[in-house]
UniProtKB/Swiss-Prot annotation:
Main localisation: cytoplasm
Gene Ontology process terms (BP): cysteine biosynthetic process; hydrogen sulfide biosynthetic process; sulfate assimilation, phosphoadenylyl sulfate reduction by phosphoadenylyl-sulfate reductase (thioredoxin)
Iron is among the record's keywords: yes
Catalytic activity: [thioredoxin]-disulfide + sulfite + AMP + 2 H(+) = adenosine 5'-phosphosulfate + [thioredoxin]-dithiol
An example molecular function term from Gene Ontology annotations: metal ion binding
Inducers of expression: Up-regulated by sulfur starvation and repressed by cysteine. Also induced by O-acetyl-L-serine (OAS), a direct precursor of cysteine, maybe via inactivation of a putative transcriptional repressor of the cysH operon whose activity is controlled by the intracellular levels of OAS.
Keywords associated with the record: Cytoplasm, Iron, Iron-sulfur, Metal-binding, Oxidoreductase
GO cellular component, one term: cytoplasm
Compartment(s): Cytoplasm
Family: Belongs to the PAPS reductase family. CysH subfamily.
Name assigned to this protein: Adenosine 5'-phosphosulfate reductase 1
Length: 233
């Protein structure tokens, strides 16, 4: 089994010119290789909805983890409920941080995300994901290369130094148009905020509509020297 500890650059190749740009082949390999030990950490944005639909073709009881920071839009929680109805076999887990928002405010001050967004993301996303991935050799992510410079060199299979794991990214060759074309063709239900100028959706206090079509993540942490929540750095 390919793991972080015995990592070697994978020699396996996946087709990039098939209708799924390799995504379905990657998922079949990953679930065949890791089985129930493979976890998908999903934000339930549009890429997540597409990837869940593809996952369901391969493993109908897959484990999906949502990092429930307690700060998400109500539309995001409503989207999760609709996903549960459409894919009843999935094991969708809402992983909460150790600290409630009230406890975090007591320890670190009110609205930590406004003063120390990196610390807030660490407490409410990074630590919970580390706990969720404990004992799992690999996890799935919906990263795409065209999401921005920090993701441009992502491979199908990646040695993940942050979580000491193997990060599997089936959608790396999908474009924004590919995502929406698949969504339309398969009549997928998605977060309505995408239709209101939010191509990338995270916690409500730190997410605004995108300011430029060239940078789909330009609405995240607006006005701050921050582009990632810490999960993919």
């Amino acid at each position: 089994m390919l793991t972080y500890d015995n990592w070697e650059e994978p020699t396996i190749t996946f087709p990039e010119d098939d209708p799924y740009k390799g995504a379905l082949s990657v998922l079949k390999w990953a679930y065949g290789h890791y089985g129930d030990q493979l976890v998908y950490a999903c934000s339930f944005g549009i890429e997540g909805i597409v990837l869940i639909d593809l996952i369901y073709k391969v493993k109908k009881d897959a484990e999906i983890v949502f990092l429930d920071t307690g700060l998400h839009f109500k539309e995001t929680y409503e989207t999760i409920e609709r996903v549960k109805e459409r894919y009843p076999g999935l094991n969708i887990i809402l992983k909460k941080p150790d600290l409630t928002l009230e406890e975090q405010a007591e320890e670190h001050g009110d609205k930590l995300w406004e003063r120390e967004p990196n610390q807030c993301c660490y407490l409410r996303k990074v630590v919970p994901l580390r706990e969720a991935l404990s004992g799992h050799p690999a996890w799935l992510s919906g990263l795409r290369r065209d999401q921005g410079p920090s993701r441009a060199n992502t491979n199908f299979l990646n040695k993940d130094e942050k979580f000491k794991s193997v990060k599997v990214c089936p959608l790396i060759h999908w474009t924004w148009k590919d995502i929406w074309r698949y969504t339309s063709r398969n009549e997928l239900d998605y977060n309505p905020l995408h239709d209101q100028g939010y191509p990338s959706i995270g916690c409500a206090p730190c997410t605004s509509p995108a300011f430029t079509a060239e940078d789909l993540r330009s609405g995240r942490w607006n006005g701050m020297a921050k582009t990632e929540c810490g999960l993919h750095e």
